[in-house]
Amino acid sequence: MKIALGIEYDGSRYFGWQRQDEVESVQQKLEEALSIVANAPIEVFCAGRTDSGVHGTGQVVHFETQAIRPLQSWCFGTNANLPDDIAVKWAVEVSEDFHARFSATARRYRYIIFNNKLRSAILPKGVSHYHYALDHQKMHVAGQFLLGENDFSSFRAAKCQSHTPWRNVHHLNVSRLGNYIVVDIQANAFVHHMVRNIVESLIEVGQGRQPVEWIQWLLAQRDRTLAAPTAKAEGLYLVDVHYPERFGIPKTALGPLFLADN
């Protein structure tokens, strides 16, 4: 049978999602816990391979197993064998043609900025601290230049392995919740570091160093060296993955749970 899981994790102490030799990854910890429940080796496939320090509240994985377990056992049993910073949120049996990555039609990320003069000792690895005042409204206006299908070479990491820089951004919203600025972006897919590169360029606009039209200009240049540096990893969350309704993938609160809109 094939099982899909919803996964939440704090990526602070992991070297990204993907299993690697000699370093700890989220995938490694999850597979070890699932293998205990299944009493057999389990390999998982994820919707999005997040980088070192990046978090997930809406990650989706699937795996195949011959072990017959109640769905709640894949949740409670796995959680009992996971570290505190990784958790299974739900489990469903899915059809054989489901694939966590290739069946996905969209992914959604949130980047959380703690915009305050002084840093906080709470959630130091769960938000990115920027001490200078940011105009979130200008950031939002600038972000609208990125909507639709475009060549995102200006916001693509040099080591990106994707065959094409073209992506389709469905929405990009910037809002303020108290001292938190939330950059919420959804696209069919993302090139490597795309969200973090966009965010740091939007911060340039929010701080007043660049006009809102600068984002439109950057997009047209298709040159990564002209955009801002890559934003810090700790503010980024994979919050949702979209699938066709026929797969029956549950919908949950986007997170992270400290935001008021949850």
UniProtKB/Swiss-Prot annotation:
* UniProt entry tagged with the keyword Isomerase: yes
Residues binding substrate are 109
Q: Which UniProt keywords apply?
A: Isomerase, tRNA processing
How is this protein organized at the quaternary level? Homodimer.
* Family matches, as SUPFAM superfamilies: Pseudouridine synthase
The text of the family note is: Belongs to the tRNA pseudouridine synthase TruA family.
Per its UniProt record, what NCBIfam families does this chain match?
Answer: hisT_truA
**A GO term, aspect molecular function:** RNA binding
Kindly state which reaction or reactions the protein catalyses.
Answer: uridine(38/39/40) in tRNA = pseudouridine(38/39/40) in tRNA
Q: Would I find Electron transport among this entry's keywords?
A: no
**Protein name per UniProt:** tRNA pseudouridine synthase A
**Active site annotation, chain numbering:** 51 (nucleophile)
Q: Which InterPro entries match?
A: PsdUridine_synth_cat_dom_sf, PsdUridine_synth_TruA, PsdUridine_synth_TruA_a/b_dom, PsdUridine_synth_TruA_C, TruA/RsuA/RluB/E/F_N
Which terms does the UniProt entry file under GO BP?
A: tRNA pseudouridine synthesis
What organism is the protein native to? Actinobacillus pleuropneumoniae serotype 5b (strain L20)
- What's its job? Formation of pseudouridine at positions 38, 39 and 40 in the anticodon stem and loop of transfer RNAs.
**Pfam families from the entry?**
PseudoU_synth_1
Which EC numbers characterise this protein's activity in its record? 5.4.99.12
Gene name as annotated: truA
Xref: CDD domains:
PseudoU_synth_EcTruA
For the protein in the UniProt heading, the enzyme class is: isomerase
